[in-house]
């Protein structure tokens, strides 16, 4: 029987930069960080109910590309916030690449507002807020 969603894994080019973005700017918590014998790095970041598993190859990684129209794949990662206007302003102040400013969500049955930014490697991040 399913218990919950556990984690999603992703590759980044620079572990320190990824931890700065996800932990310092978005508020995830560093749960574990290790260096493998080949020099690559792995970290688990607690997102408050599920984890983000982050891999950083020793030789770095190329910038992420969006899933092409008509192709299968993960489109974005979504994190839930109490106030996405404040979060978006914080990210803008920090110089994060902005994709779409806060707006009312299309799927209002689930989310109230959404916004989109890119992490340091170009991965699309959705900021979401519910109207509880």
Give residue ranges: language-model regions.
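Conserved active-site tyrosine of GNAT-family acetyltransferases
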Residues: 18-23, 91, 122
């Amino acid at each position: 029987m399913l218990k919950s969603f556990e984690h999603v894994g992703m590759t980044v080019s620079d572990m320190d930069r990824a931890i700065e973005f996800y932990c310092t700017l978005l508020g995830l918590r560093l749960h574990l960080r290790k260096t493998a014998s080949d020099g690559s790095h792995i970290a688990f970041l607690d997102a408050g109910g599920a984890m983000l598993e982050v891999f950083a190859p020793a030789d770095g990684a190329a910038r992420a590309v969006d899933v092409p129209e008509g192709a299968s794949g993960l489109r974005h990662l979504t994190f839930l916030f109490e106030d996405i206007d404040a979060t978006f302003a914080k990210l803008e102040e920090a110089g994060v690449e902005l994709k779409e400013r806060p707006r009312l969500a299309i799927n209002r049955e689930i989310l109230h507002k959404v916004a989109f930014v890119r992490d340091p490697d170009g991965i699309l991040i959705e900021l979401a807020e519910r109207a509880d």
